[in-house]
């Protein structure tokens, strides 16, 4: 229905020339008929005029004959009167005049009925009035009876001549009119046939034009229908593409959130593992039940109760840490499954987008532009994520290699120490065996007064972890490596979907110092981190300083707490400042719990 006004307009536009052509043909036909009628009427009018002229001439001739007869009667009356007058005067004179009149009348009568000299109808017509006048005079002068008869004969003869002439003229005129009418009818018939032929040709042309116009309108209607269907398909495709773009954007946002949460969980798991490792290592190294037993035996009751409560609290905390680790690992597995599902859904949506783009076939649609922009953004973010993961893996690989080298050195040192210890042990073995029995007897005497609970308790992991000046004893007391503002905290979101696995200090270029004593194990550039310095603080603790503009130390350097190791700069992503990480056995720790 939306194209009905357009169709009516098209039909009106195309039908106007056809109607005009039909009217023109009809007008031409009427004009031809009118001209034919005028041609027919003109000869008839001319014939009418001619016939009227002829009839007038005949009528004039008849009128002239009547007038001549009337004059004859009058002359007859006059002659009679004159005759009576002459009779009254003298009989002789009238007789003599009568004879002379008879002679004269006969001569005139003979002359009047004689052969005409010229034979011209017009001359005879002209002499007729004279003959009539002579006859009148003869009748008046001669014998009145004979003169009247002659006059009547003359009039009758003239009438007959005139009648014959008029009959011939009428016949000729009738024949002429018939021939002319026949010719006129033939011309009219030819004109009518020509007009009819022209009318038929015009109608054929009009019919052909109407058929062409109908075909054109049909094609136009078909094209409009096809265009409407195409536009409807484009509209549906655009709607579908817009919906898919929205789903793709939502899926990508959800994926980024899930990935960020996954990274956060991984970081927490790593920190928890590091904490558990520290506890286990501390318990293994510093497990001294005999010393604790001696302390509990000799301690006052108040000190003993406080120590036991503290020890139970620490052990309970350690158990909670282990439980948290189990929960985090389960959540991590669930999060990884969600991410895998979201990635599969995202790939399916992207395939659907590509299919819709191919089917739609429109290059100037805003939805396609948005889809291409969105795909480009997703690809860019994905590349950034891959780069960050690659950089993280590269850093972990570097630290792993450093740890391997360090372990090799430790093995070598341990082997040397073992050999030295074996030599010393061989020398002191005898003395040690002799003193062993004495020490055992002394311990049995000391343990006789302890309860079973006192004998089973162990020292808490926080007691005696490392040496008194070790890195583990400095937690919460370390100084900031640079004078800056911490803007990227541990576990917070980072641009590109990653999270901070340390602390980022925003600052202009400034001096960077070591947070604790140690040995420089790496000082060079690293992809994704810029210039990097790694300091080994012993006991499997290391600190990492990334984003340096310059490095002031080299591999193998011994540094103290507060020693300058370089100057801050910016990370490859553009963040200006210093990025600090603290790790234990390769697992990240939260620097905020170590820096005061």
UniProtKB/Swiss-Prot annotation:
Basic and acidic residues bias: where?
25-90, 161-184
Q: Which UniProt keywords apply?
A: Coiled coil, Signal
Residues in coiled coil: 177-281, 318-454
**Annotated Pfam families:** Peptidase_M23
- Listed GO molecular functions? metalloendopeptidase activity
Signal peptide position in this chain?
1-20
Q: What Gene3D superfamilies does the entry give? A: Glucose Permease (Domain IIA) (2.70.70.10)
Q: Would the keyword rRNA-binding turn up in this protein's UniProt record?
A: no
Residue ranges for the region (Disordered) are: 25-184
The text of the family note is:
Belongs to the peptidase M23B family.
Q: What else is known?
A: Present in outer membrane vesicle formulations which are used as vaccines in human.
What is the protein name given in its UniProt record? Uncharacterized protein NMB1333
- The protein's organism comes out as Neisseria meningitidis serogroup B (strain ATCC BAA-335 / MC58)
């Amino acid at each position: 229905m939306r194209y009905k006004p357009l169709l009516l307009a098209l039909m009106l536009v195309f039908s106007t020339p056809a109607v005009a052509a039909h009217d023109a043909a009809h007008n031409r036909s009427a004009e031809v008929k009118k001209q034919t009628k005028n041609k027919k009427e003109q000869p008839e009018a001319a014939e009418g005029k001619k016939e009227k002229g002829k009839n007038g001439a005949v009528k004039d001739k008849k009128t002239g004959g009547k007038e001549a007869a009337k004059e004859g009667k009058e002359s007859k009356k006059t002659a009679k009167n004159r005759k009576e007058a002459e009779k009254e005067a003298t009989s002789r004179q009238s007789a003599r005049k009568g004879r002379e009149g008879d002679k004269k009348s006969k001569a005139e009568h003979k002359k009047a009925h004689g052969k005409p000299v010229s034979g011209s109808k017009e001359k005879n017509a002209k002499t007729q009035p004279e003959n009539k006048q002579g006859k009148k005079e003869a009748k008046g002068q001669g014998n009145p009876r004979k003169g009247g008869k002659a006059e009547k004969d003359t009039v009758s003869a003239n009438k007959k001549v005139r009648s014959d002439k008029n009959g011939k003229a009428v016949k000729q005129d009738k024949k002429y009119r018939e021939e002319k009418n026949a010719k006129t009818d033939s011309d009219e018939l030819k004109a009518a046939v020509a007009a009819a032929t022209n009318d038929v040709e015009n109608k054929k042309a009009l019919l052909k034009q109407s058929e062409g116009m109908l075909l054109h309108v049909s094609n136009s209607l078909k094209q409009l229908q096809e265009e409407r269907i195409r536009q409807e398909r484009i509209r549906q495709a655009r709607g579908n593409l817009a919906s898919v773009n929205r789903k793709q954007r939502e899926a990508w946002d959800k994926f980024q959130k899930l990935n960020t949460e996954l990274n956060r969980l991984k970081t927490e798991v790593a920190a928890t593992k590091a904490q558990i490792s520290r506890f286990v290592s501390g318990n293994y190294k510093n497990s001294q039940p005999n010393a604790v037993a001696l302390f509990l035996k000799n301690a006052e009751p108040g000190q003993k109760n406080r120590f036991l409560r503290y020890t139970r609290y620490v052990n309970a905390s350690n158990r909670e840490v282990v439980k948290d680790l189990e929960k985090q690992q389960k959540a991590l597995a669930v999060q990884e499954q969600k991410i895998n599902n979201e990635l599969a859904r995202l790939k399916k949506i992207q395939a659907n987008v590509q299919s819709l783009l191919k089917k739609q076939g429109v290059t100037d649609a805003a939805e396609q532009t948005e889809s291409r922009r969105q795909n480009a953004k997703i690809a860019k973010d994905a590349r950034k994520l891959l780069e960050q993961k690659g950089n993280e893996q590269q850093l972990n690989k570097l630290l792993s290699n450093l740890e391997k080298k360090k372990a090799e050195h430790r093995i070598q040192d341990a082997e040397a120490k073992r050999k030295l210890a074996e030599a010393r042990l061989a020398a002191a073995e005898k003395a040690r065996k002799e003193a062993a029995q004495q020490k055992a007897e002394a311990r049995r005497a000391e343990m006789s007064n302890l309860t079973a609970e006192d004998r089973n308790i162990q020292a808490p992991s926080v007691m005696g972890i490392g040496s008194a000046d070790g890195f583990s004893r400095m937690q919460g007391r370390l100084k900031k490596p640079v004078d800056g503002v911490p803007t990227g905290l541990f576990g917070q979101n980072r641009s590109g979907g990653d999270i901070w696995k340390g602390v980022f200090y925003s600052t202009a270029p400034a001096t960077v110092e070591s947070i604790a004593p140690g040995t420089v194990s790496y000082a060079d550039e690293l992809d994704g981190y810029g210039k990097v310095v790694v300091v080994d603080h012993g006991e499997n603790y290391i600190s990492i300083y990334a984003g340096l503009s310059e490095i002031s130390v080299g591999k193998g350097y011994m540094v103290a707490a507060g020693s300058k190791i370089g100057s801050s700069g910016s990370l490859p992503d553009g963040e200006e400042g210093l990025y600090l990480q603290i790790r234990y056995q390769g697992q990240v720790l939260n620097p905020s719990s170590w820096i005061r």
